[in-house]
Amino acid sequence: MSKLQAHNEAIINAPISNVWAIITDINLLDKVNPGVIKVTGRMDKQGETRTCEMDNRGKRGTMTEKLVELVHEKKTVWAIENDTMGMAKMLKDPRFCFCLEKLGDNKTKIINESYYEPANLMVRIMNVLMMKKKMGEIQGQILSNIKNIAEK
């Protein structure tokens, strides 16, 4: 796997099964990920793909990702297969992961990690100056959205 670039975690006051249901439900992705407008595909079976219509601060496009690892109530790992927004050109071997840990009957730790290698020198500079920070902010928002849905 590529280098870890961003890591965030949260404690959610909900059973691990509820949190798992949220992160594997295709119908909730637009409520979880702030850039997703619409999504098709599957998020609950290893090897399946999802295609997301995205709006990244006014730049619209699509991203197709493959679920390359799925461990029930433990872990999901997504890899970008192709996109129209340029991420695949900027990042080598991007992976986006969720890891869950049961802390109690009604308490779950969720970790969101982004792995990738900058594709060239310019992207390496951008990564240090802004991309890693922005990735971390997006992860924080995603975890907050999951927490809000799970704790309702």
Locate the predicted segments by residue.
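Hydrophobic ligand-binding cavity/cleft-lining segments
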Residues: M1-K45
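Residue-level marker for the onset of beta-strands and adjacent loop->beta junctions
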Residues: A6, I37, E48-R50, M63-T64, ...
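Generic structural detector for well-ordered beta-strands
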Residues: E9-N13, E53, K66, C99
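Beta-strand elements of well-folded, non-transmembrane domains
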Residues: A14, N56-G58, T84, Y116-N120
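Hydrophobic pocket/interface hotspot
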Residues: N18-I23, L29, R50, L67, ...
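Hydrophobic-ligand binding "helix-grip"
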Residues: K31, G58-K109
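A conserved amphipathic terminal alpha-helix motif
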Residues: I111, Y116-K152
